[in-house]
Amino acid sequence: MAESMPDSRSGDPGSKASIGRRVPAGAPEQTLPMIIIVTGTPGVGKTAVGKLLAERLGSEFLSLGDLVKTQGLHKGFDRRARSYIIDEPAVRWMLNGYLKDHREKRIVFETHSFNSILHKTHGMVAVVLRLDPLVLARRLKGRNWPKLKIWENVEAELIDLSLYDSLKVLGKRRVYEIDATGKSPGNLVREILIVLHKGKGWSMKSLPNWLEKYDPVLLSRRIL
């Protein structure tokens, strides 16, 4: 599979656009996994952390949102949800082919979900960023998101949806859970590198359950 695809924005069918961005930095950590997925509910800080992690490792950075837009891997724009309708078969074909053809590259991939688009491969791990649901609600409100969409994402965070999806695809040994609440991207990257080097994976003791802290009904009344 080619490293680049025609850029749907250019209008020139012969033009090319790299699907990823090489981030120059220091020497890669040879002991770390080759595919590091940074995932979590929209609004937890995946993009900032993923870019900084890629820079720290001298790795390539890929973002599902960017790929969908720049490569035209969507079926249109959902105005109510304010997001593109992902063409999952197209994304799955392009992304898995790219990863297969570039096994020698370390790649940091940022996405809110990957259970329906990525095949489990050797050297793949997921880092699930978590965020206090009330902090998440305030952050999304600051982005002028509709109340209903804010609640949908807060609810997903409350019930550990991103964590569940990651564990379902990769299993406990390849999933790491990090609480991003009150932490800068730099601090989160340092924490991620520590847990990846330890290589112990996920456990029930990783983080507190948000449902132990918040009553969903009371929280929804504060948001809606």
Give the residues covered by each predicted segment.
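NTP-dependent small-molecule kinase module
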Residues: 3, 29, 104, 167-224
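Hydrophobic anchor at the beta1->P-loop junction of P-loop NTPases
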Residues: 38
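P-loop (Walker A) phosphate-binding loop of NTP-binding proteins
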Residues: 41
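Conserved lysine of the Walker
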Residues: 46
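Hydrophobic positions on the alpha1 helix immediately C-terminal to the Walker A/P-loop
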Residues: 49
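ATP-dependent small-molecule kinase phosphotransfer cores
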Residues: 60-118, 214-218
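Conserved phosphate-donor/acceptor-positioning beta-strand/loop module used by diverse small-molecule
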Residues: 122-143, 153
